[in-house]
Amino acid sequence: MVWDATNIFLFIANILTLLYILYNDAVIPLSKGKTVLSVKLRSRGRWDGYIFVGIIVLLFVSNTFFREGPFSTSVLLAVMGVLFIYICFFRSSKAVFKETGLYYALLFFPYAKIERMNLSEDGVLVIETNRQRLMLFARSEKDLEKMLAVFTTYS
């Protein structure tokens, strides 16, 4: 394997992406106590995923067939492509509700820090903390009712 700057960058990016996947899918459900509710949310950036995976595919094809670059770079690009295909198309964003707070976008928000909640007409639950505004885009009305029931029970 050739360890030039490109391969080092791709290797670090692949490791960080794998750590993100493991944290999101394995660590969050197990940390901070029992999971009360896990709700899949509406996806909002589907086209971003298409563009990003398309760029990775173009880089792979360019490196493999046109530039005849190092094989190690092609392997690292292929691994990155597989990881991002999983992230963009198979994994969905979710809110994980625990007994003491909720996980959203990899961060934990205790129920005690929530100052205000608003519900929009199109099914968006807006949660305001002292520093941030979280927008939970529920997939269905039933999911929204489940989230509100958890908030009324545990906050």
From Swiss-Prot:
<dbReference type="Pfam" id="PF06173">
    <property type="entry name" value="DUF986"/>
</dbReference>
<feature type="transmembrane region" description="Helical">
    <location>
        <begin position="46"/>
        <end position="66"/>
    </location>
</feature>
<comment type="similarity">
    <text>Belongs to the UPF0266 family.</text>
</comment>
<keyword id="KW-1133">Transmembrane helix</keyword>
<feature type="transmembrane region" description="Helical">
    <location>
        <begin position="70"/>
        <end position="90"/>
    </location>
</feature>
<keyword id="KW-0472">Membrane</keyword>
<feature type="transmembrane region" description="Helical">
    <location>
        <begin position="8"/>
        <end position="28"/>
    </location>
</feature>
<protein>
    <recommendedName>
        <fullName>UPF0266 membrane protein lin0773</fullName>
    </recommendedName>
</protein>
<dbReference type="GO" id="GO:0005886">
    <property type="term" value="C:plasma membrane"/>
</dbReference>
<dbReference type="InterPro" id="IPR009328">
    <property type="entry name" value="DUF986"/>
</dbReference>
<keyword id="KW-0812">Transmembrane</keyword>
<keyword id="KW-1003">Cell membrane</keyword>
